[in-house]
């Protein structure tokens, strides 16, 4: 945020890749809960001062620099963000009726609905975001909701048709076949129905 002089947007997600969770040894844990715990600590670091001493109840992440802090050389100090009180935080959303979007609204994070979702599923995110904002006495602003879309502009119709539909080796077809395989393996193919 400091390098970008306030033009930084923090993109976050609890992550849906089971392989990442397995590699980290958290395959059977509630990754949404771990994500919430991590975000709480990040926000506390940005709002706090050294030595931080962050120790939230029911949160696995504890942060302190009390023993190693050496202010004369900058040890134990985490810089404040350029944007105050913090940069904009945008969270990706895939699941229809995602409960995570409620938490985004409650924390004033902004949702980004995935590019491959059918419109009927992306539309379910708005109601949950508005519910989250209402939970903290605020009104949701549609300008805070982003919907990703994949757009390809070709030199002519034939190229566009080949890229999007006819050529089985096109990057577009490859991307969606990979997404579909991942969703089927994770039993989440409902996003395509």
Locations of regions flagged by a protein language model:
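Glycine-rich, histidine-containing beta strand-loop boundary motifs that form or position
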Residues: 12-16, 115
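Extracellular/periplasmic catalytic domains that process cell-envelope and extracellular macromolecules
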Residues: 2-3, 81-84
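Acidic (Asp/Glu)-rich catalytic clusters
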Residues: 1-7, 102-106, 130, 134-140
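Acidic/polar active-site rim loop that often engages polyanionic ligands
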Residues: 15-26
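An alpha-helical appendage that flanks or caps ligand/catalytic pockets
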Residues: 29-82, 120-193
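A conserved active-site cap/scaffold subdomain adjacent to cofactor or substrate pockets
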Residues: 97-126
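Active-site mouth loops of central-metabolism enzymes
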Residues: 85-96, 152
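Structural preference for beta-strand elements that scaffold enzyme active sites
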Residues: 7-11, 88-90, 110-112, 142-148
